[in-house]
């Protein structure tokens, strides 16, 4: 569950290291984002010579959450840390690589480019 002011790791090579959620997209009263949801983030920490710099406001897809993800078969999956992948306005990843595993739930939300770049899909 990601809400405003939540800090997330960045799971791609866009140049950002840490971002902070400043808005959950999908309705004016929406409080929380889950895996596959799009949020607006502010870059809080970035590496030199990256594609993005500190202070940039971008959109991102939540790819890992510390909160449980319940599946239809009754199994539960959770990750150690919250993570997101930065995207542009066309919903394409800014980076060219994705680090770490991503859950299958991204496929249902039509983030196929992220799934194809990920090294492991759980």
Swiss-Prot record:
CDD domains according to UniProt: Ribosomal_uL14 (cd00337)
Pfam family, one: Ribosomal_L14
Any single GO BP term: translation
Alphabetical keyword list: Ribonucleoprotein, Ribosomal protein, RNA-binding, rRNA-binding
Matches recorded under Gene3D superfamilies: Ribosomal protein L14 (2.40.150.20)
Molecular function (Gene Ontology), one example: structural constituent of ribosome
Segment forming the signal sequence: none
Function: Binds to 23S rRNA. Forms part of two intersubunit bridges in the 70S ribosome.
Subunit-level organization: Part of the 50S ribosomal subunit. Forms a cluster with proteins L3 and L19. In the 70S ribosome, L14 and L19 interact and together make contacts with the 16S rRNA in bridges B5 and B8.
Record's protein name: Large ribosomal subunit protein uL14
Lineage: Bacteria, Pseudomonadati, Pseudomonadota, Alphaproteobacteria, Hyphomicrobiales
């Amino acid at each position: 569950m990601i809400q405003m002011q939540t800090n997330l790791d960045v799971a791609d090579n866009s140049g950002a290291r840490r971002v902070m959620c400043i808005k959950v997209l999908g309705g004016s009263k929406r409080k929380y984002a889950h895996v596959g949801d799009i949020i607006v983030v502010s870059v809080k920490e970035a590496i030199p010579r990256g594609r993005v710099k500190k202070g940039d406001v971008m959109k991102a897809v939540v790819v890992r959450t510390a909160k449980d993800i319940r599946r239809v078969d009754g199994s539960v999956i959770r990750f150690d840390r919250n993570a997101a992948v930065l995207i542009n306005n066309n919903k394409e990843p800014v980076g060219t690589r994705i680090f770490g595993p991503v859950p299958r739930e991204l496929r249902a939300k039509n983030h196929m480019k992220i799934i194809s770049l990920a090294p492991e899909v759980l």
